[in-house]
Amino acid sequence: MLDPLKTSSYDYNLPKNQIATYPVTPADSAKLLIFNRSTNTIIHSTFKDILEFLPNDLSIFLNDTKVIKARIFGVKDSGGQIELLLNKPLFMDRYLVMIRGKVRVGTKLLFDENLSAIVEEVDEDGSRIVEFFQDEKKLDFLSLVEILNKIGHLPLPPYMNREDEKQDEQNYQTLFAKNYGAVAAPTASLHFTPELLKNLEEKYGLNYLTLHVGAGTFKPVDVEDILSHPMHSEYFEIGIDAKKNLDKANKVLAVGTTVTRTIEYYARTNKIQGECDLFLNPANKPIKVDYLLTNFHLPKSTLIMLVASFIGLEKTLEIYETAIKENYRFYSYGDGMLII
């Protein structure tokens, strides 16, 4: 029996050939499933025609975070190879990272470009806190990003099951990516072309906020009671203009789950900057966002639970089943859905 508060209820079976490992071109030729809540109907279209389905009186919000080449390979000074994934910066030029390979507190890690790191702490979940240096000089975030963009790799999601390629540098960034800090792209926005963005800007105006997507976005919910899940936190900022437009907005379309969580966190706390750890689910529904544009998400993830916060568990599973039957492509490089 389905229970919206049980993780096992959010499971579904997806054929492997429907996991998108590369995007379609052009980007707006991706399929778009539109679910209209007032008529309880599903329409199949493409992103190119999205304006046909959007209400007139609408404020659109997007995430302008930029993905870092956050995956780097190196060695321990004592020998032995390691792989490091930068998750996010902390205070005082310290960084939360994930490391593949055994490393203890005090271990020194060596990388190209004379980059090194020293492990300062080990978190309960196995993450490490490190400091980065170049030629023994401690690095601030922007200096680190500059080096990572020379030696690092884009951290493609594990379900793509492939290494990053040159074309991903363009494909896995949004057209409006501006503020470095994410280790995953806000994927609903990968479907836009310059022309489509221009048309949306002319009709509605576009608003940008920032949430730096962290590695926690891929963390599975591994407890059966979803309300016991420890939600990850991610840094966000809402600028003055975006805040003004959000406050006076009549109807809000959030492009992606990251935008949804940012706006809903602001609606609950009135904070325009900080760490967002909001977990939206059927027991914690949206209060500010009216419409959602998003991709199709992993089973048992907080992201599919967020979708269910808009339309309920049963309707979410029904739509996903329809998308599978209609051969939609799933996950980061896949097709999308619009809830109106």
From Swiss-Prot:
GO BP term, example: tRNA wobble guanine modification
Chief place where the protein resides: cytoplasm
Leading EC class: transferase
Pathway connected to this protein: tRNA modification; tRNA-queuosine biosynthesis
Compartmental location: Cytoplasm
Keyword Transferase belongs to the record: yes
Presence of the UniProt keyword Cytoplasm in the record: yes
MF-aspect GO terms: S-adenosylmethionine:tRNA ribosyltransferase-isomerase activity
UniProt KW keywords: Cytoplasm, Queuosine biosynthesis, S-adenosyl-L-methionine, Transferase
Transmembrane stretches, start-end: none
A single GO cellular-component term on record: cytoplasm
The protein's assembly and partners: Monomer.
Family label: Belongs to the QueA family.
Stated name of the protein: S-adenosylmethionine:tRNA ribosyltransferase-isomerase
